[in-house]
Design a protein with these regions (language model features):
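Short, solvent-exposed loop/beta-turn-alpha elements that line the ligand-binding surface or hinge
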Residues: 107-133
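Positively charged n-region of N-terminal signal peptides that target proteins for export
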Residues: 1-4
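Bacterial N-terminal signal peptides
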Residues: 7-14
Length: 369
């Protein structure tokens, strides 16, 4: 009898604990096949549950609830609790944070780039204020591998590119594309497949893993290897301030730590998926093209021209102390290039990012109104 009573008590205690667990409603937003839906967010919530002893958990609705171009207001208004905020979609709201996108031509290692972005924004008071104004708390960034031209038309020379409509993910890429003679067009990543298939766009300025991540195999016929820039202007696991305010300081720290696991999985996925996507693409008949020397030279000259004028451009956009901030980001990128040199796994990178960035953040004041 005592054994039965004890068992019932244990079960009841477990039910009560489960009922009291707070649940985060996330929207990874890029569809069920995207790495954040398949691995990133699940890893985050598994780690969060572990670190908080079950006090917090969560689930992801990868599509259908909120699109990437709606995420800013969705987080602010409580439609969802967590999701990715793409700075170029809301450039007026993220003038200071968006500086990282303007500097996306710097660096080649996406592990170092993403970590430099994360540390820059997390330690930038003006940046954190931007998120707070929109009812959000910033918890880090990832970054893609190098960008190429994924197209429906063959692009080998500048004359091939001239006049084509190329989807870009922000002002930096639009500048490069326009200077090279094409017409930049702008719409969410979730609409790329339809735009290429219908002829609204002739190409997208994206990384090779996007062939898999957003299933472009049946829309793209050519990949021109230009290796210019990455996409680093996104906060992939932004949390609603409503949720953050409910968390204890210990749980806030756990949340920041768990979020790194989602982002570093994405970082390594970009690296791992590049080779896989290229292999599948070639099997499907997609042609990979090395552009001619004139194309390469023009691209390099435009990149250098862009970087020479970036401080002035940022100042005109409203970034305060732009020169000092550019120098700060460059220093962080150099620091992280050294730190990641011997990192071999996503978990190792997640813990390194937590140690170097989030363990040093004052969780009492971070993200506060």
């Amino acid at each position: 009898m005592k054994k039965i009573v004890m068992t019932a008590a244990i079960l009841a205690f477990g039910v009560i604990n489960y009922a009291q667990a707070d649940t985060i409603r996330a929207t990874s937003a890029f569809g069920p096949k995207h790495v954040m839906a398949q691995a990133g967010y699940p890893a985050l919530f598994k780690k969060l549950k572990e670190l908080t002893d079950g006090r917090w958990t969560g689930y992801d609705t990868p599509s259908g609830l909120v699109g990437p171009n709606e995420m800013n207001s969705a987080l602010r208004e409580g439609i969802t609790d967590m999701g990715p905020v793409m700075f170029p979609y809301f450039s007026a709201d993220y003038v200071e944070s968006g500086i990282v996108g303007d500097l996306s031509m710097l660096g080649t290692d996406n592990r170092a780039i993403a970590s430099a972005v994360s540390e820059y924004i997390a330690t930038c008071p003006e940046c954190i204020k931007e998120f707070s104004k929109n009812g959000q708390v910033y918890l880090g960034s990832d970054a893609t591998t190098a960008y190429q031209l994924l197209s429906t038309k063959r692009i080998e020379s500048l004359s091939d590119l001239k006049g084509l409509r190329v989807r870009t993910g922000g002002a930096t890429y639009s500048y490069i594309i326009e200077k090279m003679g094409a017409l930049p067009v702008y719409f969410p990543a979730s609409e790329i497949f339809e735009a290429l298939s219908s002829g609204v766009a002739d190409a997208t300025y994206s990384s090779i893993p996007d062939l898999k991540n957003i299933q472009l195999y049946d829309a793209v016929k050519y990949v021109t290897l230009i290796d210019k820039g990455v996409f680093n202007a996104a906060a992939m696991t932004n949390l609603s301030q409503r949720v953050w305010d409910k968390m204890s300081l210990e749980d806030r720290s756990s949340m920041a730590r768990a979020a790194q696991y989602a982002q570093t999985i994405a970082i390594y996925s970009w690296r791992d998926t590049a080779a896989e996507a290229e292999k599948i693409a070639k099997e499907k008949g997609i042609e990979f093209i090395q552009p001619d020397k004139e194309f390469v030279k023009r691209g390099n000259n435009i990149r250098d021209e862009y970087m020479a004028g970036v401080t002035e451009a940022l100042t005109k956009k409203g970034v305060t102390n732009a020169a000092a901030k550019v120098d700060s980001y460059k220093a962080l990128l150099k620091k992280w290039e050294g730190l990641v040199a011997n990192v071999t796994t996503s978990d190792e990178l997640a813990e390194l990012r937590y140690k170097e960035i989030w363990s040093k953040v004052d969780m009492k004041t971070y993200g506060s109104h």
